[in-house]
């Protein structure tokens, strides 16, 4: 299993590839609450 930091790195690399317009912090934090502490405060 990917660690919290590792998952966060993959997440942001994916965001950079596809664009922020396709992502929503609140939806993602709700879908994966275990990763919420790793998300930068927006």
Curated annotation (Swiss-Prot):
Note the subunit structure: Heterodimer of an alpha and a beta chains; probably disulfide-linked.
Recorded GO terms, molecular function? toxin activity
Role of this protein:
Heterodimer: conodipine-M catalyzes the calcium-dependent hydrolysis of the 2-acyl groups in 3-sn-phosphoglycerides. This activity may be supported by the alpha chain. Conodipine-M inhibits the binding of isradipine (a ligand specific for L-type calcium channel) to L-type calcium channels.
**Intracellular or extracellular location(s):** Secreted
Please tell me one Gene Ontology term that the record gives under cellular component: extracellular region
Q: Which UniProt keywords apply?
A: Disulfide bond, Secreted, Toxin
This protein's name:
Conodipine-M beta chain
> Which GO biological-process labels does this protein carry?
lipid catabolic process
Where expressed (tissue)? Expressed by the venom duct.
Asked if the Swiss-Prot or TrEMBL record annotates the protein with the keyword Disulfide bond, the reply is yes
């Amino acid at each position: 299993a990917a660690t919290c930091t590792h998952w966060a790195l993959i997440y942001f690399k994916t965001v950079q590839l596809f664009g922020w317009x396709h992502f929503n912090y609140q939806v993602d934090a709700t879908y994966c609450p275990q990763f919420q502490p790793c998300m930068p405060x927006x």
